[in-house]
From Swiss-Prot:
Listed GO biological process terms: DNA recombination; positive regulation of metabolic process; regulation of DNA-templated transcription; regulation of translation
Keywords on record: DNA recombination, DNA-binding, Transcription, Transcription regulation, Translation regulation
Family to which the UniProt record says this protein belongs: Belongs to the bacterial histone-like protein family.
Matches recorded under CDD domains: IHF_A
GO CC term (a single one): cytosol
Job of this protein: This protein is one of the two subunits of integration host factor, a specific DNA-binding protein that functions in genetic recombination as well as in transcriptional and translational control.
GO molecular function: DNA binding; structural constituent of chromatin
Protein name, entry field: Integration host factor subunit alpha
Gene that encodes the chain: ihfA
């Protein structure tokens, strides 16, 4: 099971008493701010959760799996996530729920 933005909005509606519209907007604004910061080359640090970073990857040789032909994989920028120690500890000590 995956946590969705709709489920996050529903949680805010239930726990904080926000209207469904406001809860949805809050979730959207939160993620938009993370996107904006990353687009501007900024690191995103969420205390107790983890960091989103940008990493530049160089061009490298690759291979088309169907034809075996050598093809270059272009240089690109990727987003990476490094979980914080608190998140790591909680995940390591958690007991997963059966679906």
């Amino acid at each position: 099971m995956a946590l969705t933005k709709a489920e996050m909005s529903e949680y805010l509606f239930d726990k904080l008493g926000l209207s469904k519209r406001d809860a949805k907007e809050l979730v959207e604004l939160f993620f938009e701010e993370i996107r904006r910061a990353l687009e501007n080359g900024e690191q995103v640090k969420l205390s107790g959760f983890g960091n989103f970073d940008l990493r530049d990857k160089n061009q490298r040789p690759g291979r088309n799996p169907k034809t075996g032909e050598d093809i270059p994989i272009t240089a690109r920028r990727v987003v990476t996530f490094r979980p914080g120690q608190k998140l790591k500890s909680r995940v390591e000590n958690a007991t997963p729920k059966a679906e």
